[in-house]
Amino acid sequence: MYRAITRNIQVTATPRYVAERSEPDQGRHFWAYTVEVANLGQETVQLKGRHWVITDANGHTEEVHGAGVVGEEPTLPPGGRFEYTSGVPLNTSTGIMSGHYEMLADNGETFSIEIPAFSLDVPDVRRVLN
């Protein structure tokens, strides 16, 4: 679990390797990640956009920009939480994701909050040798 707090908004990310959607022999790996955004502050905020930076083990970087998350632009009152799960494919067995969300406060102010960097790693495969 990876966590960052910006301006009383907590973002927690938990990645998980999805073996059933991966084909390691063909260099295709897939991870699901669950993100929870929690409003720990006193103002109502709305998540308006996202910016992800995804880097594989070869240093290839892809940037993803978009409105909201998973088709929604959730509003979080004080104490409110929003959780979603999405996925990312890579051509390498490791990588890293990071980024930020664009938020809108009740007073019309826009600001960015950090999405913590998190690693994408194929779980260790233990081999037993006799």
UniProtKB/Swiss-Prot annotation:
Q: Where is the ApaG domain?
A: 3-127
What's the short name of a Pfam family annotated to this entry?
DUF525
Q: Where are the transmembrane segments?
A: none
Q: Which superkingdom?
A: Bacteria
**What processes does the entry annotate via GO biological process terms?**
error-free translesion synthesis
NCBIfam families to which the protein is assigned, alphabetical:
PRK05461.1
Protein's UniProt name: Protein ApaG
